[in-house]
Amino acid sequence: MNRFILSLMIMAGGAFASSADNLVLLTTNDTHSAIDIGADGVGGVLPRKAIIDSVRKAEKNVLLIDAGDVVQGSLYFKYFNGDVEYPVANMMNYDIRILGNHEFDNGLDELAKYWKNVKADRLSANYDFKGTVADGIFEPYVIKKIGKKKIGFIGINVDPHSLIIQGNYEGMKYSDAIATANKVASMLRKQKKCDLIVAVTHIGYEAIPGKASDVDLARQSKDIDIIVGGHSHTYVDPATPEKTPYWISNADGKPVLVTQTGKYGRNLGYINIDLDALDKVKDGKRAFEYMYIPVTDRFSPEAYDKDIIEFLVPYKHAVDSVNSKVIGWSMQDMQNNDHAGTYANWVADFAMNTGSDIADELRKSDPSFPNIDMSFMNVGGIRQPMKQGAVTEGQILSTFPFSNRFEIIEIKGKDIIDALKIAAIKGGECVSENITVVSDDAGNLQHVYINGKEMDPEKTYTVATIDYIAQGNDDYVTMANNRSLWQSKEELSQYILNYIRNLTAEGIPLSANPNRRFVTNISKYIDK
């Protein structure tokens, strides 16, 4: 069944071939507070719920699963801290949920407050919360009986080190994702006699070297049949298996289905499992049908959940009022998911300009305060794209939702270079236009140039950044080897808002320098 036919069936009210011998898994991941339907008519909790209701009406055995990061990324979380996302998820009647890293953004106390009220099986096999406020909330696995079959589900979470701010998970103990998943899966298979085992993960389809990923888990497993993944925002689209393979051979050569639906609730994952053919393998595939259901506003208003509509009214009014405040104008589209693209450049150049202005101001009272040599920001902090046209206050607050502080640090060149090695593997990062990072085709760093000269590993540089990076997070561990010179009291987003307002007051629209800072062509950057 292709997804076009599936979509037509959903719109028609669900004319599926329902069977007691089948199990349907509907999956989401990384919805990131995307409550409203997008400007392009895609996403939104109301169309998602309408699709879920249609499938549940048509199929006898349906389980709704979320692979983490329900929160963070829009004004709904910025202003209401989970008061919207968690109740809405409960109204959708999820069966199984796991944590993402952004569930920790407001600390363990807030996490525990909301997750105690989650109406679903709450799974985490490799986070130990004993002795913390979250103790007793999560179980490592759950077994669902579907007909005569036992289906085991395991929750596997991401390594928090250099990803989650340390104080936000203080007291929690992490265990290796792959080792834990395999241990629990083996127990479920051998002791609990499960017929099918599903790992629900928030570790990413792929990861940097040294970090576990879904592909690694699939390859190193023996007892896991399906991985429902999240974290990397990867579109593991069954329509394009050449880009992101979704059948991965395990340690015994048996195919494992690896899935992920991208981000922002733009798709629902749909996995139809033939429970009478669980051991059948043909052409490197199992008896699991996997596809995307696009979440679009194709439904009539009557199909939308009235309780959710009523619940959202006061929150939506507050969000819409901020989203309507125009503060500037952008000359171009800027994508937030391009590590070496225009939005990354714009953010880095904003940081360089603002950091230099701050340094100039500080020198009035301290003439010895150094000039800013470069900026180093993170693409992960840019949560939304920017479209050509009007720029609103709400758009900026949604794009930069974190409570990061602007910071100026001193740090050795060798520590910057080591961090840029990681950035190169990721495909790029937000660095100022006076920086050129040269790598080979595999992403291995070869040279770092600053103002056209090779960066000196032993020299101390002054860098404009954010506290999150300065603490060694986002895998940039060596950036923590710094001396802080100054940190803002206001959040980064306020500096960006003021920067845009000042540009607008001068009649200057937003535009980004398109020149790439991460390159593979070495010849033009050799010192003259």
How would you label these PLM feature ranges?
Residues N61-I65, K193-V200:
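Short beta-strand/loop segments at the ligand-binding rim of alpha/beta enzyme cores
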Residues D40-S54, Y174-A181:
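Short catalytic helix/loop segments, enriched in acidic residues and glycine
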Residues N22-D36, L63, V71-S175, P209-V322, ...:
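Active-site-adjacent helix-turn-beta-strand microarchitecture at beta-sheet edges
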